[in-house]
Amino acid sequence: MPSSTSNFDFCRVIPAHPWRGIAVLVALIAIAATIAWEVYVRSIGYAPTLNDTEDLWAETRRRVTPGSLVIVGDSRPHFDLDLDELERGLGSRPVQLSQGGSCAFPVFKDVIDDESFHGTIICSIVPLMWFAPGGPLVENAERAVKRQQTQTWAQWASHLLAVPLEERIAFLKMDELDTRGLLKQIPFRNRSNAQVGPALPPFFASIDRERRARMIEECAQPGPLQERVKNGWLPLFTPPPPPSFVPPEAFRARVGQAIEQRFHDTAALVEKLRKRGGKVVFVRFPVTGALKEHEDRLTPRQGPWDRVLRDSGAPGIHFEDHQELASFDCPEWSHLSAPDSVEFTRRLVPHLRTALQMNTTAAN
């Protein structure tokens, strides 16, 4: 029986408009706007490339087998190591797990904590990043590790659908050309309880399906983009001031304890892998210009680098120890150009073979 408040006789009248033509017009406007946006972003320097997402990292992490050659680190091995040259020189295709803007320790730990893994790790050490006690650098790596462990079917399917689109469409640049990225470009001043962090570098590299990063030519050559990337490094590599609500002495003590723990944990993980027959070689990749001066001042070589090697007993390759590695110039102070990365890797391979005792093994 109908309710007294219901009206079963109601009929919505659809206005007599040319709806099919309107739908076609809206579709054409959307297509035109999409094409215009794509043309515009390409005109300001963007190009189609994969986003280095947590899902892409998780996909790559799953390629690690018990005997794999794995690259772990920050953005420098991401840019500076050529996978083809490493495969040619070391005999196996490496798995690229480096991440830009991250502390590599959580990834280092994740790989070694896999009890089935007994392979080789090439690990980059940038002390200001490796010994970060917490914050975004550590959180970036932890999110990637967590995604690999908890990725849902929906996230996996979304990633598979996104890859062919990102390879062809320039404006699908996450964190820069999406709404969130564009909003981040609005300048805000620091406030007493809300400090604005340093700006991240703009688009200056391409990423392929194996997560091989290559500096784009516009950044490799002197110009506005190169200067913009350069000018961003010093603020990013300057530790933030202690929180105003924490006494400076207590803050320094807490950070000091975290750094000491990181030294201890690094050595323990190297030993853990060594007992399973695995190997680790630490590498200090080229850095030049004002950024090198800045890093040398804050973390002298005689400090963190030497101690990591001493505590862990692992071999290390420092670019400054070898003229053929030290002669490279980083266009934007922190990474090698795409052509230089190939030559650098070619020159690095003999040192890796020596550090990993591959020459001795081959001779026997």
Indicate where each model-derived feature is located.
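N-terminal Lys/Arg-rich, disordered targeting/topogenic segments
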Residues: M1-W19
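Hydrophobic membrane-insertion alpha-helices, especially the h-region
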Residues: R20-Y40
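C-terminal regions of proteins
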Residues: D296-N364
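Membrane-embedded segments
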Residues: V72, R76-L160
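Secreted/periplasmic serine-hydrolase-like ester/acetyl group-modifying domain
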Residues: N140-R276, A363
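Short hydrophobic beta-strand that contains or immediately precedes a catalytic carboxylate
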Residues: L69-G73, L336
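Active-site segments of SGNH/GDSL-like serine hydrolases
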Residues: L269-R297
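Alpha-helical transmembrane signal-anchor/signal-peptide segments
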Residues: R42-R62
